[in-house]
Regions:
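N-terminal leader/targeting and accessory segments in enzymes
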Residues: 1-94, 98, 241, 269-274, ...
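Acidic, Mg2+-coordinating active-site environments of NTP-dependent enzymes
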Residues: 55, 70-76, 170, 185, ...
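Receiver (REC) domain switch/active-site residues of two-component response regulators
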Residues: 60, 195, 402
Length: 493
């Protein structure tokens, strides 16, 4: 592929000098000659402070906001191309989309506190079963017919639009992506042409960033009110009371909706679920027609994730019957109610990414119908993150599991014992809770407790393969550790 070259006008900007740029970057250390350097406001310092370094490295133009322009006023040559806009993050995202120029023709996005990764993965899997080339983008990276590792659930807009362009150029026609509240608030999804968007649920998380439920919901709702075209479809899970109201609001605004849930008033609703040790059988209806399908997935909540994905795929143009026929072939996302090991006595171990109070309660409650005996849960909370959810996680766990072990998650720069104490504080009156700091030891102890018919759910880290302690990432995989513990205790090693 030849050099990509676009004028500022072609990127949607009006500048006093309509120069051409050959790249877009937000990092002055990565500037190449001919780049557009986007000087964004930061938490501690404005990116405009580094604009002169970017120019010295060869930047052909600067994109910034009024505050950035004020920083540059005394240093910048008045003839140098500069674009000043009030919402610089949104402008950057749209410019990145225009610069890279293409994306899979069918894109959907899903937001919500929990379930985003599973829904995006299920969309991709359904499309693949329908013999369509597809990817999913989110917490577990870019997966499917074109792959790429990611460091954020919703990547920065330059990375995102580069990924979408490369995927499209490789033949990918369909894409499903997670839309995190951070990504939405920071305008990273602007420029993605959506056919449909889904809202799974809304509970407490990320209040360290958004500060209030109102701000958190406003970030989530941006996906529909700002990014979703009016001719596209919103898929809303109305089992969540707040989302039931929100669905009505969107309908009044003129949006096309597919509502899902367990209420027969929904377009797509679950009427019955039967659980067994390896999955569930689902009875559901869509617009007057009833279906019975097998899901080889653990956890009742996965049924709603599957139907959310099915609705998004239907909303983006696929035949409902063909979509529903694929459901028995779906597999779980790494780290989402993922099978880890089985003891010789038949007791099973699963791993889940649940790391919020609601997710912990949901995961344990969903695992319960698959367990004949005691349900043991391991929980922990991450350091340098929302502290208010820690005692709530402890309370949620002791109220839903038969025994709980509190251990370290990713303590980061916090004192691990202090984090555990905050989790334990939510269950001070409970007798079914134990504290074991070392995560490997906690898993070993929990596996040792398992009797015939019992089940162990290890929550918090899911697909992660490292534990963040201080500034270091130490190798640690919950699935691998559970397998090792079972093998050791059952005399297989």
């Amino acid at each position: 592929m030849g050099e990509n070259r676009k004028t500022l006008g072609e990127l949607g900007f009006a500048a006093h000098v309509n120069v051409a740029v050959t790249g877009v970057t937000i990092d002055n250390r990565l500037v190449k000659r001919g780049d557009l350097f986007a000087a964004l406001p930061g938490t501690n310092v404005h990116g405009a402070r580094f604009a002169m370094d970017a120019i010295a490295a060869g930047a052909a133009a600067i994109l910034t906001d009024p505050d950035g322009a004020a920083v540059l006023k005394s240093d910048l040559d008045p003839d140098f191309p500069i674009v000043v806009t009030s919402d610089v993050r949104a402008a950057l995202s749209r410019a990145a989309a225009l610069f890279f120029g293409t994306q899979p023709e069918t894109m959907v996005a899903v937001t919500g506190t929990n379930g985003k990764t599973s829904v995006a993965s299920f969309c991709r899997q359904i499309w693949n079963e329908l013999e369509l080339s597809a990817i999913s983008i989110g917490t577990t990276g870019v997966e499917g017919d074109w792959t790429y590792p990611l460091h954020h659930t919703t990547p920065d807009p330059i990375t995102l639009h580069s990924i979408l362009a490369q995927a499209a150029q490789s033949g990918v026609t369909h894409g499903a992506m997670e839309a995190s509240s951070h990504g939405l608030d920071q305008r990273r999804l602007e420029g993605v042409a959506l056919k449909a968007a889904g809202f799974t649920n809304f509970t407490q998380d990320h209040l360290d960033y958004h500060h209030s439920f109102e701000d958190y919901f406003a970030a989530k709702s941006r996906l529909f009110e700002k990014l979703l075209p009016m001719d596209a479809t919103a898929v809303i899970n109305t089992d969540d009371p707040k989302l039931s109201i929100y669905a009505s609001d969107l309908a009044m605004l003129g949006y096309t909706l597919i509502t899902i849930g367990t209420n027969a008033a929904n377009d797509l609703y679950i009427s019955d679920q039967r659980f067994d040790a390896t999955g569930q059988t689902l009875r559901f209806s869509f617009k007057g027609k009833t279906y019975v399908k097998r899901l080889n997935l653990i956890g009742g909540f996965q049924a709603e994730n599957v139907l959310m994905a099915a609705a998004l795929v239907i909303a983006s143009g696929s035949d409902p019957q063909h979509v529903f026929d694929t459901l028995e072939h779906l597999t779980t996302v790494r780290g989402r109610m993922q099978y880890a090991a089985t003891r010789k006595n038949g007791a099973s171990v699963f791993v889940d990414y649940a790391h919020t109070p609601d997710a912990v309660e949901t995961a344990i409650s969903a695992f319960r119908p698959h367990v004949m005996g005691r349900l043991i849960a391991i929980i922990g909370a991450g350091g340098d993150r929302d502290t208010t959810k820690r005692p709530l996680m402890g309370r949620a766990a002791v109220e839903t599991a038969d025994h709980v072990i509190v251990t370290d998650d990713n303590p980061r720069t916090e004192d691990p014992a202090s984090i555990r104490a905050m989790v334990m504080a939510g269950a001070t009156d409970a007798a079914n809770i134990t504290e074991v700091g070392d995560r490997a030891e906690a898993i070993l102890r929990a596996v040792h407790m398992l009797e015939p018919g019992d089940g162990l759910l290890i929550t918090g880290k899911g697909h992660e393969t490292g534990q963040i302690v201080g500034q270091d990432i130490l190798p640690f995989d919950d699935v691998e550790q559970a397998s090792v513990a079972v093998a050791a205790l059952d005399g297989m090693i």
